[in-house]
Design a protein with these regions (language model features):
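Short, conserved recognition motifs on repeat-domain binding surfaces
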Residues: 1-385
């Protein structure tokens, strides 16, 4: 007797199963619009705001480098880096502050941009995807009138409703003290001030946070370069809520201004340090021995002229560091023949732009889903695909 025929497999129409499949599409801007072109059912799911949030959360740790917010002394604009059909239009992210106003871009992270609105003495947390803006008053205790400040923004994994801001600077009571505080949008308040001594003032030269390098997150800590009477790095441990100073392995304040030094993750893990001298890139790593003593160790040295096929005799200037994209672990390097991304562990590189004299270049990473509704998805497909 033959066994009964198994029932035919049901067509793929289960919302949950399809959602799990679509979640695993690459985090490129064209992925969901392309999926939505399959049929009305797929389009309904791909354009659903709730699914869009899930898609962004799923790819939070591997978002593409969408572009950079560049400041050319006249205005700030979004400079896209991806090729069509994944290229986010330049007009998609108009800058949050009008040209001519005084401000500093303090960094980008987790799809948010953090800005110090100097004329208002406020921090602005801006979500370019939604246009949402949150303004935060600087808490008491920071000498914002006399010194520079640094800050970093972050989100908890999968949380697109709340954020934290870490603020560091000089104490307004004792300028040779570094202070820090953390703001939570969940509570709407700043934590108590944390402090640590800075090097003493020398000939009127005060040590303060260097704003030319945005905060870099390595593990559970943020790092800033210190400018002035110091060759040190300021560390803020987010879990322990503590500040500490770490000596730089090499370099000085002049190297900061010339774009020769940057804090970054080390190869393998831990705290790293990139130092440029001419066409040579040195990769340093912070190591701790069995006695708990930490020190810097020089790892690899890389000839950038050979890696990037630069003619060292014809180059107008030496390479310099423009920025660092944390999630993609790539450094943005300026050269006279173009601006490159370099992944130093794999030695992979890509030319992004022709050379520009930009005052500031902040890499912007995130999962951009190209549209908020069905009609915008169709417009995206008509334009690019």
């Amino acid at each position: 007797m033959s066994s009964p025929r198994s029932s035919a497999a049901a067509p793929l129409d289960d919302d949950d199963l399809l959602a799990e499949i679509l979640l695993r599409l690459p985090p490129q801007p064209s992925s969901l619009p392309r999926a939505s072109a399959v049929c009305k059912f797929w389009r309904s799911l791909a354009s659903d705001p709730g699914f869009s949030r899930r898609f962004r959360a799923h790819h939070r740790r591997n978002p593409p480098l969408l572009g950079c917010f560049v400041h050319d002394f006249c205005e700030v604009r979004f400079q896209p880096t991806l090729e069509p059909p994944n290229r986010a239009p330049q007009s998609r992210f108009p800058f949050a502050i009008a040209a001519g106003d005084r401000f500093h871009i303090l960094g980008c992270r987790h799809g948010l941009v953090l800005i110090f609105h100097d004329s208002q003495k406020q921090l602005l947390v801006w979500d370019p995807f939604t246009g949402d803006q949150h303004r935060l008053d600087i808490p008491p205790g920071f000498a914002v009138e006399k010194t520079w400040i640094g800050a970093a923004v972050l989100r908890a994994p999968g949380d697109f409703h709340h954020f934290q801001v870490v603020l560091v600077g000089n104490s307004d009571i004792q300028s040779t003290q570094a202070v820090a505080s953390v703001y939570s949008s969940l509570t709407g308040v700043w934590d108590r001030l944390i402090s640590t001594p800075l090097p003493p003032e020398d000939s009127g030269f005060l040590t303060m946070v260097y704003t030319g390098m945005p905060a870099v997150m390595v593990g559970g800590s943020f790092y800033w370069l210190l400018y002035g009477n110091s060759q040190e790095i300021l560390e803020f441990d987010l879990d322990k809520r503590s500040l500490a100073l770490i000596p730089m392995p090499v370099g000085n304040t002049r190297d900061m201004g010339e774009g020769n030094i940057w804090v970054m993750p080390a190869e393998g893990a831990g705290l790293g340090f990139l130092f440029l001298r001419g066409f040579c890139a040195q990769l340093w790593k912070r190591k701790t021995d069995c006695k708990g003593v930490s020190s810097w160790v020089l790892g690899r040295s890389i000839d950038l002229d050979k890696l990037l096929s630069l003619n060292s005799e014809m180059e107008i200037g030496y390479p310099s560091i423009l920025g660092f994209a944390e999630d993609n672990n790539v450094v943005l390097l300026w050269t006279s023949v173009g601006i490159f991304t370099v992944q130093f562990e794999s030695l992979q590189f890509k030319k992004l732009f022709e050379s520009h004299d930009w005052y500031r270049c902040c890499p912007f990473e995130g999962v951009y889903t190209a549209g908020k509704n069905k009609s915008s998805y169709l417009m995206f497909l008509d334009y690019y695909c």
